[in-house]
Each structure stands twice: as structure tokens, then as C-alpha cells.
């Protein structure tokens, strides 16, 4: 907390969006439409390539069966994320889905962006899914506020090297980056890379506060603690 951050890197689930939205809305929506989507789009090159990857994961198994098994394990694998993302894209485009963010999020993000503070996302969800979620909120589209959307192609979120790589790609010293997440192991990895961290502790998500890092109940509290603008 000794260096004023120039870049805020944000997690999504449990940080700016309720975990329940992903697990109780997005996942069931995709699950119910997997079979129909694969049947309708399986011949498209992108989807055919994803199905081939699934066959390598579970040789000979029906692709929908493999997708469902991966969803049951909350597996972070490319073919599943791609197909989920395509299904969600259709849902958002049709108006069947609207993302849910915590009410403090949009005003604070707009205040930060308006002050010149740089913003980026780092989530286990695909870049495409991140853009969908932030592009279809009750507060309007928020994607233009962010310079970059990082996913696990940068590496695992519990690997310090991932955070160092993000700082390099954004051309900012790690000490000038602030990472916000609800997950202590992710904060530990970022801190190891020399990045400032703050744990977002949302009561709705049942987050357990860590004794090792600064904590905040929402983004407005982060703004106060790290001397950044708030919307007040």
C-alpha cells in the first residue's frame, strides 16, 4: 500500500460479480443447451476442432457426455470454455442473458477510468466470456473501460509467473499494479511477483478473509484504502 497503483487488475467471480451468477445462471444455461449447440454447429471448423480436442481427452466418448463431465468438475479446459462462450454469446445477443455485477462496481470502475487509472481483467473464464459478461450489464457496456482481458492463456492464476507476465505485457512495474481477488492463493501468487494485492470479501459469496493481505468489502473501500478516485 506504499505505492499508488497505476493499473488495477481485477478478478471477476467473487470480486466484481457474484459467484452465484456464474454457477447458478451461466453454467446451467450452457449445460441445458450443449447437446443442441453441438448438433447445430458441430460441422463449423472452430467447433469441430474443439470436438476433436474432446476426443483426445476422452477417446470414443460422446462429446456432449465429455462436456458434461468436464462441467461437473468445473474443469478449465479450452474446448469447454469455447463452447460455453459461444452458447452464452447467443444468449446475450438474444437478450436471454444479462450479467449481474455488484452495485458498487460500475460507478467505481467508471470513476477510476475517468481519472486515467488503467484497468484490466484476469479471470479463469475465457477472454470472450469476460467481454460478454462486461458488455451486457444492467449498467450498460463496460468493456471500453478495460485495456486488456487476460485469461489462463497467460498461465495459472496461482502462478506468480502469470502476474509478472501480465505486468510486462502492460509495460508497468509490478509495484505499480494492484490486483483485486477474493481468492487468497491468487493474491499470494501476485504478491510473490511484487504486485500489490487486496482481497475483496463479499458477504454474499461467503468469502473468508485472509489475515495475510489487506481486505475490502467492495471497490469503494479499495478506492479509499489505495488513494484512488471513488464515485462520491
UniProtKB/Swiss-Prot annotation:
Binds 1 Mg(2+) ion per subunit. It is an enzyme of class 3 (hydrolase). It catalyses: 5-methylsulfanyl-2,3-dioxopentyl phosphate + H2O = 1,2-dihydroxy-5-(methylsulfanyl)pent-1-en-3-one + phosphate. Pathway: Amino-acid biosynthesis; L-methionine biosynthesis via salvage pathway; L-methionine from S-methyl-5-thio-alpha-D-ribose 1-phosphate: step 3/6; Amino-acid biosynthesis; L-methionine biosynthesis via salvage pathway; L-methionine from S-methyl-5-thio-alpha-D-ribose 1-phosphate: step 4/6. Pfam families: Hydrolase (PF00702). Its cofactor is Mg(2+). Keywords: Amino-acid biosynthesis, Hydrolase, Magnesium, Metal-binding, Methionine biosynthesis. Monomer. Bifunctional enzyme that catalyzes the enolization of 2,3-diketo-5-methylthiopentyl-1-phosphate (DK-MTP-1-P) into the intermediate 2-hydroxy-3-keto-5-methylthiopentenyl-1-phosphate (HK-MTPenyl-1-P), which is then dephosphorylated to form the acireductone 1,2-dihydroxy-3-keto-5-methylthiopentene (DHK-MTPene). Belongs to the HAD-like hydrolase superfamily. MasA/MtnC family. This is Enolase-phosphatase E1. It comes from Acidiphilium cryptum (strain JF-5). The gene is mtnC.
